[in-house]
Amino acid sequence: MERGEVYDARLSPTEGSEQQGTCPVVIVSRNAINDNSPVDVIVPLTDAANVKRPYPNNVLIPAAEGGLSMDSMALAGQVRAIAVSRLLRRRGVLSADTMRAIDRALRITLDL
């Protein structure tokens, strides 16, 4: 598993407003960590049509990029670590431009 790859992941159980169920996620942790850790840091994705208020830490990803079937929104405000065993099917890889946008969104979220 590598940074920028999109996977379907089992995110439940969750609480409150956390992204839940099986949904696409993008791996954002560095490859050196991904190669040696039982967990990956991910940003969940959701159907862009479901996002009522886009925040500056959300990133629009057009359909077909990364193997996505619809326009999606990366929710950098919900960045989290998950066990590799939660990752199911690999969908594809996001472009370098999209990953730079996600990096900017993560800097906003984490005040880096």
Task: Label the predicted regions.
Residues 1-112:
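Conserved functional hotspots at enzyme active or ligand-binding sites that engage polyanionic ligands
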